[in-house]
């Protein structure tokens, strides 16, 4: 306890010195995280209008540990959808007071034997329905609220599950605040528990290959979740889950490395000047120090690290103004940088709510309550659990759109190259090759053994939205174990870019 107090005092001294050097006035009110939630929830996803879902109303009751699922036909669907297996459901989380996890299941448009893929949107606290209708789900929403087929939906080659998590996200809810999650242990245990009951209800999928995917803050969720699944398999807990790999898109995984890359990326993209670069870099040493304390001293240190390190990003944003930090080629339009308003309109429709079984629950794209609850988790390093998975043959794909600032490809590339595992030396020395889709280079791929890194061209933070065809092809090759093989005969090797 004494060591923790001394460390925090040292952190305050370092931060104060850095702030004085920069002329920065730090917020003094005790409600700083709440204020930050409104300003910075956008830094990994969207600004919500409400704290979280409200008004459970006539949501069907379900016993703890049980799953209640219904076959779904959404209003506005195109013709022919009745032949497919679309489901929505609630899982009543055991060992909680009242927590219910909402999910969609879209069976493959191909065959039942296709892999099972689970998708996790980041935030923390942002609904996976954002991905369902704007990224890689079966449909897109038009302005008149009708749905159109997404021909590049990931359900064309997989049985895909979209989950609202942690509790309080999207349509997942609890009437008891004690069910709010604050760390990856709680999040991953909930997801593992859900999978056990899901595969019990759907034994036809239990032996299929299983992959975990997601983006943004899922760079935290996914390594912990994959480790929990692998641990359960090794301990023969319940149903064996046939985990083959996981893919993280533009994720936040190793904050110490990724925050340090902000200024380098911003300078490389001509977003800031060299003088700005030198000035903002003065925040890096206190950020690194704060993250070290977070790894040893717990919640108070982690909150301090969040405040210190985000001064790097906020300083850059003061200079870039209205640039869309999810895609620096674009301007930020309105509060959200993207217009996802049709999603909340769609889920505000009574017929839609009745179809998916959520009663009168009010849908919120992103929850400030969940965001604030996870602030002490933000600066933790989730890379540390990945090497053990690689050593056991779990395939890992880290991909990143090249125009994203907030979880940029450079920071992701650096932590992947820095990761210590038995294949690190060979991975670092391996050559990069073009990722070719329909005869054109869609990205640059580097692979060795079970580890791959893909830099995706002409894409920002949300690769499936910006490059739907390339992202679908990426998933197909990854799940079929062909990510490395298929480009070998297409184009010759090209020079590597430097990994720093």
Swiss-Prot record:
Disulfide bonds join 126-366, 294-309, 332-337. The keyword Hydrolase applies. One of its GO terms (biological process) is proteolysis. Keywords: Carboxypeptidase, Disulfide bond, Glycoprotein, Hydrolase, Protease, Signal, Zymogen. Substrate binds at residue 407. PROSITE patterns: CARBOXYPEPT_SER_HIS, CARBOXYPEPT_SER_SER. Glycans are attached at residue 144. Induction: By gibberellic acid (GA). Inhibited by abscisic acid (ABA). It is an enzyme of class 3 (hydrolase). Residues 22-73, 485-500 form a propeptide. It catalyses: Release of a C-terminal amino acid with broad specificity. Belongs to the peptidase S10 family. This is Serine carboxypeptidase 3. It comes from Oryza sativa subsp. japonica.
